[in-house]
Structure formats: C-alpha cells, structure tokens
Amino acid sequence: MQKKVVQSASKNEELDPHYKRSSVPFPYGLPDYDAEYQFINHHMQQLLTRPVEGTHSASVHPSTSSTSHISSPSAFSVQNPNPNDAPFVGNIGLDASGFSSGGMSEYYPRSVSMQQSQDVHFQNTEIPYYHRSPSSDSFSPGVVASVNPNSNNSPTFYSNPPALSNIPIPLNNSPYRPEDAYFQLQGAGVKADINPYNLSPYSQYGPEGTAYSNAQAHHQDGAPLQRVCSAPDPPKTSMPPFGSAGSPSPNRSLNVSNNTTPPLSTVNKIIKKPKATTGKVKKRLPQAKRACAKCQKDNKKCDDARPCQRCIKAKTDCIDLPRKKRPTGVRRGPYKKLSDTSNNTKSTTASSGHSTQDSLSSKMLDPSSDNQFAMSSRQMDENGMAQYPSSAIKQELNLQPQILVSSASKNFQPNVTPPFAVHHDHFNSTSMDGVAVSNMDETGTSSAGSKPFNRKSRNRSFTNPVGMTEEHFLREYAQHSVANPSLLIHQIHGLPSEQVHGLLSHTELGNAMHNQPTYNESSIAAENVNNWMLETNDHENLSMQSHFEVPDLKMNHHDSSFFDRHIDQTAMPGQNQHGTVKNMETMHHFYPDVHNSEFPAAPNPVKSQVPYYYQSQAADDEEEDVPDHQPSWRGRIHSFSIATDSSQHVVERPCIHSLRGIHGQQDGGLEQHDGDHVNMLPDTHAEELAYTSMLLFHDIPTRDIRPDFNVHELVDHGTYPNFHQNQADSFKNHPFRQ
C-alpha cells in the first residue's frame, strides 16, 4: 500500500512535468517567506551534487527500508525530468515515528532546486530535513540521514538531529560573496538574471560558490531544470549583503539582465578611477597690511602683489589709496580733538601742561632717564658749572602739590553727602549697591579719595554678609585717622534702614546725622579724607528728643525678598514710644573718651552701649540695682540670619532675635526683665541664629579684632573671640547652653 501511494505520486510527476505539490504553509506566519526556510535551502544546495555513478535516494524508514529501495530508481525517489542526464540525489522528509494507523504522514520535503554542477566526490554528507505530522501544523526537525554515494548500504540514521547552527558548511572552505559568484558566472559565459549587489542575505548559491537563479536553474547546455516543489521567492532588496564593510559601493552596481554581460576584466575597465589633480597648487601670497581700493570697498583680504589677484580676476585697476597723516604734537590722539575753534587755545594750554606733567612723572618712574632729564634741564656756563633755570626748578617743585590738589578737587564737591554717611530716612529704598558698595571699589580704595587698605574686598550682597562684615572692619581700621567713628554709624548690612545709634554721644550723633560738613578744597589733602567727621559744628542746643526718636516701627518689605529692618511696636512688650539706647560700662576700654557725664539731659538716662538695645521706662527705674560690668549680651533686630537646621540644610530666613541679658538667677533659670528684648523665635532657633549672627556681623567689636579678620577661621576653631572678658571664648558657655 505504501509503495502504491509513493509510485502514484511519482507517476503524476512523470506524466505532468509541471506537476507541483501543495505549497508548504509557513510555520511562523511570515507574510512573504520564512527566513529559516531560505537559510536551510541555501545550505542544502551547497551540499547536493551529482554523483559519478549509481542512483541514490533517501531511505523511507528503518523498519521499511531495504537495499532494493536504494538500488531501484523508481522506489521512492524524485525522478529527474531530464532523462538524458544522470540521476541526482533527492531529499524527502519522513515521519520519525513511522506511519500511523490513521494513514500515512504527509511529506513536505524542503524546496531543493537540483542543478548540474562539476563532478565533486564527497562522503558522509549529513542532510537535515523537516517533516510535518497530520496532527500538527508546525514543522519539527526529523532525523538526519548520512548518505555515502559510493556505497549501496542503507544510510545511517541519527536520533538527535543537529541544530541549525551545526549545519555543514559548504565544500569549499574559502568564504564566498555574491559579487564573486556573479563574476565567476560571467567569466564562464553563463547567463544569470540576478544582480550580485541586489541579493538578499538568504539568496541561493550553487555548488562551489556559484550563484543560480531562484526562478530557473541552467545547465551548461542551456536545458532548464524544473523545481521539485514550489517555494516562495525571497523579495529583492537593495541593501548590500549583511551590511559588511567590504560591500560594493552604489557606483559599482550593474544592471544585470538576461543579456550577456562583459567579463570581469571588461567591468574593471569600465570602472574608472578618479584622476589625480594635475598641476601645481598656487601658494597664497602674504596678506597686505593695507588692502587696495577695490578690496577695501568689497571688504576682502588683499595680497601684497600689485595688481592683486582679485583685481586681476575682476580686470580692474589695483590702486592704493593715500593714507591720512596722523596728527603730531599735542593733537596726537582722539581725546585732544575739539570741534569748537574757540577752545583751541585752551586745549593747547591744557594739553601742554598735561604732556609736561606726564613726561616728568614718567621720567621720575624711570631711573634710566634721570641723567637725560638733568642734562636737558640745566645749562652749562662758560666755566663748566651747571646752572638750573628757575622755571625748571619751580615746575619740578610745584608738580606734586598740583597733582594732589587737582585730584582732591575732582573727588570732593562742597555740600555733598560725606562718605559712609548715615541716612536718617529709615524708609529709604536705596539699593545696597548705591549705599555700601559705591563707597568702596573692588581694590579696597574709597571712592572719596582715601588711601587704599591694601586688600581686596569680596563681593558684597544680601546673600554674602561675610563680605559686608569685612567691609565694615575695613572702614573701621582706616589709616591716618585720629578717631575713626565709622564703626559707630556704619550700616551693618549696608542698607539705609538699619542704623547704629548706641556708641556715639548725643552731640556727636546729632552732628553726624543732621549737619553735613562743608569742605574747603584749598585745605584738604588726600590723607585727611577719613577725618571728615571731626570737622563738625557743635550744636549743644539741639533737642535730644528728636535725635533719639524711634520712627514708626512697622513691618514692610525693603524689596521683593527681604524684610525691612523694623518691627512692630506690638512685638516689643513694655516699649515706650521713644526708645533709648542702653550703654555699657564695659565698652569704655574701647572708647575712653565716652563717659556718662558727656550725655546731656535726656528723657531716659542711658548707661551702657549696645546697638538697638531698647529699654522701657520701668526698667530705667531699676537701673541702679544693676551691678557694673555685668555680662550683658548684645541685642539686634535682624531681617535675616543664616543658620543650620541640620548638617545638610543651611537656611536663610527673615527673623527677629536677640540674646537675652542675664540679670540674675531666679529658681534656677534665667530671669527676663521688662526692658530686655523679646525673642521672637523659638528657643531651638535662637541659639543657632544668635551665635551665627555674632560670627557674621561681629556685634561687639574690640581692639583685638584684625582688619583681615576671616569668619571661616572662627568656624574652623569653633570659638568667637569677641565675647566679653568675663565669659569663656567657647560657645559651649553661652547662656543658652547652661
């Protein structure tokens, strides 16, 4: 029964050469073709060759196979459509489990296009195949038959088929490329209907690396071979095979058709290499310092040659325009030119004076020019004695005073706001740059003409109070000052809204705030600039009430991001309408000339010097009971302070805080009097903010502080050197730490 079915299938193929079996369904559901399907066919066609003698066919099954099946050409083998040619090897897939009781398995051998090729002897070539069982629509690998074409023995079957990666390589070990196979065919005179540069990665190759057509294979005599079974043709792709680096360029692609193509040597002649540039490359001429008229008009570079290359190409005249002579003498330079003819004499006189001074100053700086200057300025008498003219002596002697007076007259104007002046308007919205920064330039030199501090100040801004602190100490330690009170009225944060009223006597503070000194240009020298506050008029009849009046203490915004330096009266319990400045006996070592006897009658007597330390009338009555040299800490109203909530978090917040004064112990705790400042922050923040404020703003400066004081040194050492002498230098002994 089995033989009849097989023979009927073979008879159908013999009767109808165009008989095709049913197409194999795609196991993976690809729309065009199966990549694995084409990959296997590619290697199968590399293995199949025509044997020398004998007809061989694949065995049916170990249980049904015999030597008669192999010797008989009609026993389960695919017949060659061309009877004149020798038989060839066919590949038929069988069911590995044998025939089932329900009927025979459907065999779907892989598409193998047989092709006549050269006589190649090979042995033990493993041919993998796939089969499909009736109960499943998917393909599974079957057994592998080892065929020896030189023997009539039945092939050996292996139970474990090799994987696709173990498929045998082609007989020739040399790597093959599509273009090589194509040119081999063309050299042999074989026609081909494929483009070697248009092959897909799964294109078919004949034995020995020769390419063949998917649609029709040709023998050497031109007789076509029919395909054993139908298989989908792979689509044509224009991408080079595998995207290799050695793939041919698009310029090398050929339109291959059924017509005969010239051999490889002819193709190589057609491909012409680009010719090398002949001739010498002209060197660029050096660029001219002054271009010709045409190049100047076109705003182009010009070479030194005349005519230049651009003029030669444009066929124009190459002309150099005459240059304008540079003015000589006193009019040399644009800053000496004046359009008004009436000022020519003035400009000539001024320029001559400047040129004389410049030459003298330059010769004074250059020691090598002393002898020349001396020889040119003196005259030799008949006896060989040098005689200096009186004009030269007067000019040399008067040179330095003229420079000083001229510089002082330029920098100072009468009835102007003195440097570091205190703005009485507490609600002035002037920016910090116009108040504090404008008084000092980047080199540490006062804009009013004072001597430099020989130190560069850092950037001063709201977010860098350290720079403001250094600026504060630079002002205090100005040179050539008998009594420099700049610390007493300076603005701690550089803003006009914060004043320090506590360290000056009433008379000095009133004179400084209300009476601006009048400068006399003839008597002011550069080194006396810092002493402007000493030239004040005594006004003993000024009302002390007006000087120490506290303005309306209301919260407002100085700008969009910081609060003003004022608080509401409601935040100050027990505060009178007119606050007083509480002085401190312990500060007398810093200002020995300040004493309580200097203070005239005031609404509230003052005894200590602490900036912005407000005191109520009730506290003034108890002032007599307060011991002298008490450890009184400073108190201040700050709009913001920098503190650390944790080791990784640094905050800058608006706040109002102060250190509470220690007036005694009561029940083991701190006693707060009515006159003390109210701490507006929680106790957890008060310690950090108070200590940070002392580090940043130096609220109790002493003579031990240095002008180059660095706040970072304090942070490293963890101490603050400006504590009171009765207190320790460590923050651990702070009143809040007790």
UniProtKB/Swiss-Prot annotation:
- Sorted alphabetically, which InterPro entries does this protein's record hold? ERT1_acuK_gluconeogen_tf, Zn2-C6_fun-type_DNA-bd_sf, Zn2Cys6_DnaBD
* Compositional bias of kind Low complexity: 55-77, 340-352
Q: Which residues bind DNA?
A: 292-318
Q: Where in the cell is it found?
A: Cytoplasm; Nucleus
Mainly localized where?
cytoplasm
Sites of the modification Phosphothreonine? T260, T261
Q: Which SUPFAM superfamilies match?
A: Zn2/Cys6 DNA-binding domain
Asked if the keyword Nucleotide-binding belongs to this entry, the reply reads: no
Under Gene3D superfamilies, the record lists:
Zn(2)-C6 fungal-type DNA-binding domain
Q: Which GO terms describe its molecular function?
A: DNA-binding transcription activator activity, RNA polymerase II-specific; DNA-binding transcription factor activity; RNA polymerase II cis-regulatory region sequence-specific DNA binding; RNA polymerase II intronic transcription regulatory region sequence-specific DNA binding; RNA polymerase II transcription regulatory region sequence-specific DNA binding; zinc ion binding
Is the Phosphoprotein keyword given for this protein? yes
| A GO-annotated cellular component | chromatin
* Sequence ranges of Basic residues compositional bias: 323-335
Q: Where is the composition biased (Polar residues)?
A: 1-10, 246-266, 353-372
Q: Where is this region: Disordered?
A: 1-23, 53-83, 219-266, 323-372, 441-464
Keywords from the named record: Cytoplasm, DNA-binding, Metal-binding, Nucleus, Phosphoprotein, Transcription, Transcription regulation, Zinc
Q: Which SMART domains match?
A: GAL4
Q: Coiled-coil segments, which residues?
A: none
Biological processes, Gene Ontology terms: cellular response to phosphate starvation; cellular response to starvation; intracellular phosphate ion homeostasis; positive regulation of transcription by RNA polymerase II
Q: How is this protein named in the record?
A: Uncharacterized transcriptional regulatory protein C27B12.11c
Q: Native species of this protein?
A: Schizosaccharomyces pombe (strain 972 / ATCC 24843)
